[in-house]
C-alpha cells in the first residue's frame, strides 16, 4: 500500500467541477476550445474583455475535468481537443460569438489557436469553427433577414404610389 492518501474533499470538489462544466456544455449554444498558451497578460486581458462584451464565458480548466465533463455531456469526440493547455469559451445565446471573437483575435495574436468546438450539440472541427466565425453575428443575420423581408413590401408600396401618381396626373 502506498503512503499517498487521496484527499476526499479534493475529489468531491473535482466531481462538482465536472458536473458544473458538463451542465455548461449541455446548455451552451456553442463552445470553442482553444490553446491560449503564450498570450501576454495584456493580450489575455484584451481577449477576455472582448469575449465578456460578446456575452461569452471564457475559462481555463484542467483537461481531465473537461474530458470527464464532455463524456458526461455526451459530446463524443471532443476529448481529443483537450491536450495541452485548454481554454473554453461558452455561449448560451449567440452561436457565432465565441468562434468569431476567438478567430478575429487569433488573426493578430499568433499564440492563440482554436482546437475544436461544439455547435448546438454537434462536435465540430477547427475548420468548421473557423467557417462559423466568418458568418455574421446573430444581430447581423437578423438585420439581413429583416432587409430581405422588407424588400417586397417596399416594392409593393412603391408600385402603389406610382400607380396613384399616374392616375392623379391623368385626371
UniProtKB/Swiss-Prot annotation:
This is Large ribosomal subunit protein uL10. GO terms for biological process: translation. It holds the Pfam family Ribosomal_L10. Keywords: Ribonucleoprotein, Ribosomal protein, RNA-binding, rRNA-binding. GO terms for cellular component: large ribosomal subunit. GO terms for molecular function: large ribosomal subunit rRNA binding; structural constituent of ribosome. The gene is rplJ. Belongs to the universal ribosomal protein uL10 family. InterPro entries: Ribosomal_uL10 (IPR001790), Ribosomal_uL10-like_sf (IPR043141), Ribosomal_uL10_bac (IPR022973), Ribosomal_uL10_bac_type (IPR047865), Ribosomal_uL10_CS_bac (IPR002363). It comes from the Bacteria. SUPFAM superfamilies: Ribosomal protein L10-like. The lineage of its organism: Bacteria, Bacillati, Bacillota, Bacilli, Lactobacillales. NCBIfam families: PRK00099.1-1 (NF000955). Forms part of the ribosomal stalk, playing a central role in the interaction of the ribosome with GTP-bound translation factors. Part of the ribosomal stalk of the 50S ribosomal subunit. The N-terminus interacts with L11 and the large rRNA to form the base of the stalk. The C-terminus forms an elongated spine to which L12 dimers bind in a sequential fashion forming a multimeric L10(L12)X complex.
Amino acid at each position: 500500500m502506498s503512503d499517498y492518501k487521496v484527499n476526499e474533499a479534493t475529489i468531491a470538489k473535482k466531481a462538482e467541477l465536472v458536473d458544473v462544466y458538463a451542465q455548461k456544455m449541455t446548455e451552451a449554444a456553442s463552445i470553442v476550445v482553444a490553446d491560449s498558451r503564450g498570450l501576454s497578460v495584456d493580450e489575455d486581458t484584451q481577449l477576455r474583455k472582448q469575449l465578456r462584451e460578446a456575452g461569452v464565458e471564457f475559462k481555463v480548466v484542467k483537461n481531465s475535468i473537461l474530458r470527464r465533463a464532455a463524456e458526461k455531456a455526451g459530446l463524443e469526440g471532443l476529448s481529443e481537443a483537450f491536450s495541452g493547455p485548454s481554454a473554453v469559451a461558452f455561449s448560451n445565446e449567440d452561436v457565432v460569438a465565441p468562434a468569431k471573437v476567438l478567430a478575429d483575435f487569433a488573426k493578430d495574436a499568433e499564440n492563440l489557436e482554436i482546437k475544436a468546438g461544439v455547435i448546438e450539440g454537434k462536435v465540430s472541427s477547427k475548420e468548421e469553427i473557423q467557417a462559423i466565425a466568418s458568418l455574421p453575428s446573430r444581430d447581423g443575420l437578423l438585420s439581413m433577414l429583416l432587409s430581405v423581408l422588407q424588400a417586397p413590401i417596399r416594392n409593393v408600396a412603391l408600385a402603389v404610389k406610382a400607380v396613384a401618381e399616374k392616375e392623379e396626373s391623368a385626371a
